[in-house]
Each structure stands twice: as structure tokens, then as C-alpha cells.
Amino acid sequence: MSSSLAGVRTRVRIPLAFADGYSTTAQAVTFDGLEDGREHVALILGDPDLGAATPLVRLHSECLTGDVFGSARCDCGPQLRESVERIAETGGVLLYLRQEGRDIGLYNKLDAYALQDDGLDTYQANTALGFDEDARDYTAAAQMLTALGVGELDLLTNNPDKVRQLTALGVTVRDTVPTGVHANPGNLRYLRAKAEHTGHTIRLVG
């Protein structure tokens, strides 16, 4: 279990409207006492009974370029859009984690992009800058789930490390539900690196 307890700070309902016309309503939840001190937020979608049901949960790391600007260098924006709708259909939680660039920060991520343009893959670029291949720690995510009363969940992810970390932190992952594969010419190298290097469950054609 996570090393300390966090508590719910605020709950507020937010209408969500996406550029493709999809809309829904989320309950945004903020927290006090998160171990890393960051302003992570949970979006509760579909009015689940979190204490009784096994909700569908997505851990989504912040990606300004993909989530906001629609960058085609990654699949983050389409994954976020897909996750909101799928979770709203079944009831569950999307944790929006402030971990830009696999937790190296925005400017460093853009530096890594420049190295990728010179031929490195996404993981090689991070290590060339002196960072871990993936610096993300999900202790705060486990704290958030505990504060929401979620002990068992189905995890919407292609990333086996999220399953490993949550399990080690005392969260029961009943099932792993893969996201779709959002490939385009701009992100094929990125997706292939994730599949080949870190075992993401991504099936690419060609």
C-alpha cells in the first residue's frame, strides 16, 4: 500500500466537450496529502459505485503536446479521448497525472524530440539527456485510488509497468483492458519502440 494516506480536497462536476462532438460530464476530484505534492486530478465518469463495483481505471500521464495541441508524434491525445468515452460507458475513474514526458518535464521532452529527429528512439533520447527511460512513479496514483475507495479495478492500459507498480502498491488489478492502437505516420517509430522495448501490448501492421 502507498506509504501515506491522502484525502479528497474538492469534488466538482465539469461538462466535457471534445472536438469530434462527443460530450459527457465528469466529477473532478482533487486531493490533499499526495506524496509527490503535485496537482494530480481524478475524473470520475459514468457515476460508478466505487465502493462496491470494480471500476475501469485509466492512469493517463499529462502530455501537453498531444492532449492539448493534437501532436501526431505520440498517441496520447487519442488515448485520452478514447479513455474518457470507454470509462463513461462502464463507470470508472481517469487519473490525470502531472508526469509530462514520462516525468522529465515539458522542456526536456522537447529536447528529447530533437534527439529523436537525429535518430534516437524515445527511450534512448531520455537516457541521452541523463534521465531514466521512464521516470514515472505511481505512488500518488495509488493514494488517489485509496482516497476514492477503490481497492480493486480493471486497468485500461497497454503498459505492463503500470500493472506492476499498482500491484506492488497494494492495488488489486483484476483485469488489464488494452486501449486501441492510434497509429499514424508521425508516431510509428514511437509506438514501435514502446512495443519492442517495454513490452506494451501494441500490435502494429508493417
Predicted regions, residues:
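Catalytic domains of riboflavin
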Residues: 1-206
